[in-house]
Structures are given as C-alpha cells and as structure tokens.
C-alpha cells in the first residue's frame, strides 16, 4: 500500500512555513516543525550506492520530539531488536523504523531516532536501516 506510506512522509516532512497551524508546542493532528536529513540511494543506508533504475529509495532520518511522537504511535517493541543494551527499544512498521537509546554516547544526541523509507519505484514502505 503506497498511499499510507506517502502520507506519513508528507506529514513528517511538511515545512515549517506550512501556515498558521504551526505552533511552538508539538501536538498531534497538526503540522509541526521537523529538523531532518534525507538520502536518495540504492541498497541500505549504511552501504548505499547512487540510485539506479532498478533500485531507488528515499530515507528520511530525524530525532527529538518528532521521533518520540512517531515511536509512541507505531508500537509495540520488536522482540529481537538491533541493540542488546539494557533499556534500548526498537519499533518497526513497514517503512518506519524507530529506536530508543537509553544511554546516549553524546549529550547532544536524542534518545529517540526514526527513519522513514520509501521505495521510489513502487511507492511502498522500505526502511533500509541495518543493525
């Protein structure tokens, strides 16, 4: 189903200048600001190559309040996640992959991080984030 995945990406990537509905406080069911990075690639995000006609995807990465909101919405935690560190959690749902890291390596990092991936050939969800 490509429509739900595309709607999630549009909602997450809506620019800050979307109108008067953007407020300082992050709320559900309204447009909120998002600081994010994206990559258009083939393969996984860790070992990516330039996109090809046969394999092209976009992955959007973000943390902070937006990642926590998304993490809270896509539960439950996966049984076997990438991290075995105490307190770490992971949730996945088709093209959405979110993590909670209990112990941060750097004080400026966010406990919550999410990746949203879309296969640009099919429009389907494709979170290509390896462990």
What would you call each of these model-derived segments?
Residues 97-106:
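Short beta-strand elements that form the blades of beta-propeller/WD-repeat-like
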Residues 13-15:
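N-terminal signal peptide c-region/cleavage motif recognized by signal peptidases
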Residues 35-98:
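Mature extracytoplasmic domains of secretory-pathway proteins
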Residues 84, 100, 116-118:
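Disulfide-rich extracellular modules and peptides
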Residues 105-131:
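Short, exposed beta-strand-loop hairpins at the edges of beta-sheets
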Residues 1-8:
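Sec-dependent signal peptide recognition
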Residues 6, 75-76, 91, 107, ...:
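Residue-level signal for mature regions of secreted extracellular proteins and peptides
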Residues 17-28:
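Cleaved targeting-peptide boundary
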């Amino acid at each position: 189903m490509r429509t739900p995945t595309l709607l999630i990406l549009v909602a997450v990537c809506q620019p800050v200048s979307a109108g008067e509905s953007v407020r300082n406080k992050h709320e559900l069911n309204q447009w909120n600001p998002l600081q994010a990075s994206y990559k258009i690639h083939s393969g996984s995000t860790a070992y990516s190559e330039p996109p090809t006609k046969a394999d092209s995807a976009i992955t959007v990465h973000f943390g902070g309040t937006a990642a926590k909101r998304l993490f809270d919405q896509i539960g439950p935690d996966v049984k076997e996640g990438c991290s075995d560190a105490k307190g770490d959690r992971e949730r996945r749902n088709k093209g959405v992959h979110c993590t909670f890291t209990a112990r941060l390596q750097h004080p400026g990092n966010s406990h919550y991080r999410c990746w949203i991936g879309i296969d640009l050939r099919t429009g389907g969800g494709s979170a290509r984030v390896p462990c």
